[in-house]
C-alpha cells in the first residue's frame, strides 16, 4: 500500500453523503448505499462526526467515526446519548452502535449510462447500556442487530438542471426508537421489514437540500411509535468539513407527542 492510498480523497465533493445518526454514510436519518469518506477504489477514507438533535422534550447526541476502504467496505462506530429531560429528569440512555456496509454492485455517480443504482448491504449492531426505563416500558432485549439493503442513484442534471440523488433502504429491525428504548416488546418481538427513503437536490456542488422518511416498527403497547422525517440542508465547506442543519419530525417518543426540532451535525473527513 502506497502512502497516497491511505486517508486520501479524490472522490467528487459530497458524493459520500454525511454521517447518519447511527454512524453510517447517508443522510441524517437514513443510511445510503454510498461508502463513507472521499476515498476512491484504491484509497482509504476516514470520517468523524458529532450530531445533536434538540426536540421538544428530549435531546439526542450522537458521535462516532467511520472508515471507508477502497470505496467497497465501510466500518463505523457510534455512541448515542439520549437525555430524557421532562420525561425522567436527570436520566439518560446510552447506546453503542457497531456498523458495517459492503458495496455489492453499481456506482451511484459514475454509472450514468446505466439505470442500475449503487447497491450495498449493511448491518448495525446495537447495545443499549441503560435498560431500566426501556424494560419498564416493555422492551424485551438490550441488544439487537439491524440488517439493511440500500440502493442509491445520482442523476446528473436530473431535476431542473440540478443533480438529483434518490435512495431507498429496506431495513429488518426489532428496535424501539432506533434501539434507544430497547428491542422487541409485548406487542411484537420479531424482525419487521421497514422502508426508509431519501431525496436530495444539489443546488450547487457544495450545497445539498433534501428530505427523508423513515418507517419504524411499533412493538410496545404502552406508547405508539411514529415514523420519522426530516428536511435537511448540507453545506460541504470543502472535502474535509461539512455541516448539516435539519428540521426533524420524530413524532411520539414514549409519553411525549409531536416531538420535533432542530438537527445539527458536523462531519470531518480525511
What is each model feature region?
Residues 187:
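Conserved short-loop catalytic and cofactor-binding motifs
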Amino acid at each position: 500500500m502506497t502512502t497516497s492510498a491511505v486517508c486520501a480523497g479524490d472522490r467528487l465533493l459530497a458524493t459520500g453523503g454525511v454521517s447518519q445518526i447511527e454512524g453510517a454514510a447517508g443522510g441524517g436519518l437514513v443510511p445510503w448505499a454510498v461508502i463513507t469518506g472521499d476515498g476512491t477504489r484504491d484509497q482509504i477514507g476516514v470520517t468523524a462526526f458529532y450530531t445533536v438533535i434538540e426536540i421538544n422534550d428530549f435531546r439526542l447526541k450522537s458521535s462516532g467515526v467511520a472508515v471507508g476502504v477502497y470505496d467497497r467496505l465501510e466500518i463505523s462506530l457510534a455512541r448515542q446519548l439520549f437525555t430524557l429531560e421532562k420525561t425522567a429528569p436527570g436520566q439518560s440512555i446510552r447506546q453503542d452502535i457497531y456498523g458495517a456496509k459492503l458495496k455489492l454492485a453499481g456506482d451511484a455517480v459514475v454509472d450514468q449510462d446505466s439505470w442500475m443504482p449503487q447497491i450495498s448491504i449493511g448491518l448495525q449492531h446495537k447495545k443499549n447500556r441503560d435498560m431500566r426505563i426501556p424494560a419498564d416500558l416493555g422492551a424485551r432485549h438490550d441488544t439487537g442487530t439491524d440488517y439493511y439493503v440500500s440502493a442509491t442513484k445520482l442523476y446528473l442534471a436530473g431535476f431542473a438542471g440540478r443533480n438529483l440523488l434518490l435512495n431507498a433502504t429496506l431495513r429488518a429491525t426489532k428496535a424501539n426508537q432506533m434501539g434507544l428504548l430497547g428491542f422487541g416488546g409485548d406487542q411484537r418481538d420479531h424482525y419487521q421489514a421497514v422502508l426508509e427513503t431519501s431525496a436530495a437536490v444539489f443546488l450547487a456542488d457544495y450545497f445539498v437540500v433534501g428530505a427523508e422518511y423513515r418507517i419504524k416498527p411499533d412493538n410496545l403497547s404502552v406508547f405508539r411509535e411514529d415514523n420519522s422525517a426530516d428536511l435537511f440542508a448540507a453545506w460541504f465547506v470543502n472535502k474535509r468539513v461539512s455541516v448539516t442543519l435539519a428540521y426533524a419530525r420524530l413524532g411520539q417518543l414514549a409519553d411525549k407527542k409531536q416531538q420535533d426540532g432542530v438537527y445539527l451535525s458536523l462531519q470531518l473527513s480525511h
